[in-house]
């Protein structure tokens, strides 16, 4: 007779377990029919799994719509050809499509409805009513800052935003036509080498950041400054212009523009970059986030984790999709070539970057916000000859059964490239 081996309770005969399940269900129905007997919402849920290899049934606890891998590993069966050895069940899930490596309250996405929230705040509200600095504060500490907190936060970033001479020197030694990501990572690595605390943390027995939230928060804030300052240094090197020192009293984006010498009297450019940055600030367990967390599990410093995340984000199926999407439009060449290109995509000869998403089964909510930015920069974007190609692709893909049936919709990358170029 088969038995039940579960994460909770002792093994039972199948017949007893089924009878028990029926009784519990009947009792719940009876209770629901009596107004004076509330049905407890704390009753645990279980996933009942029948293992045909052993004829055992396992009951796995279900909490908030997920099961724990450690509970699944209680399921085991004899190794073929070696009946004395048991092998625990493992889960193969390429791409983490159905797997979460940790619980988080940072970002929530409903891919069916097209909803995105940071710490419970709608992306649309952050986009329209807040700037990137406030969004960073929200992501880091779980709440939007007061005015005084925001000023203090920006001051701490400013204090770390002057690049050391060695950072400037190493970037300036690179040819100006060097790949951007290569220059960016080189500069950040040098910046990290100049941060004595981060460098020391990898060579001492007492963990600098483990269970030390103040040190961790301080290091993360320095990372914000390092990223902005390195971007400015790389930009100035490539363009052959002077790098200006940071200025107190400016936001992160405003200081970046100040450092590269860009005049922005009406703040139109800084506000656009702010909102583009809010759009891309976080997206649950993305490839780069997973890479960051893998490295962080070794208890290394935040910048080492960030370098790994940036490397992951540079790929064409992640952050690099923005550039590849634009190059794809250049490859098409003209509106007349769009039907042939769409046909090639459906024949799986080409990938249509900017369309479809692993999470969203309707329009990416960030895409609608990007269109708002396009409207603000309409004149500059309309002058781009590739825009009409993009519009025609969007029109055809929106009505073609191939895309409609597969729920392939516009994502944030498709039109985002036009806004960056317009700036």
UniProtKB/Swiss-Prot annotation:
Keyword Transferase: yes
Alphabetical UniProt keywords: Transferase
GO MF annotation terms: citrate (Si)-synthase activity
Gene3D superfamilies from the UniProt entry: Citrate Synthase, domain 1 (1.10.580.10), Cytochrome P450-Terp, domain 2 (1.10.230.10)
EC numbers for this chain: 2.3.3.-
Catalytic residues (positions): 357, 413
InterPro entries registered for this protein in UniProt: Citrate_synth-like_lrg_a-sub, Citrate_synth-like_sm_a-sub, Citrate_synthase, Citrate_synthase_AS, Citrate_synthase_sf
Pathway membership: Secondary metabolite biosynthesis
BP terms from Gene Ontology: carbohydrate metabolic process; tricarboxylic acid cycle
Recorded superkingdom: Eukaryota
GO cellular component, one term: mitochondrial matrix
Functional note: Citrate synthase-like protein; part of the gene cluster that mediates the biosynthesis of squalestatin S1 (SQS1, also known as zaragozic acid A), a heavily oxidized fungal polyketide that offers potent cholesterol lowering activity by targeting squalene synthase (SS). SQS1 is composed of a 2,8-dioxobicyclic[3.2.1]octane-3,4,5-tricarboxyclic acid core that is connected to two lipophilic polyketide arms.
Family: Belongs to the citrate synthase family.
UniProt name for this protein: Citrate synthase-like protein clz17
The gene coding this protein: clz17
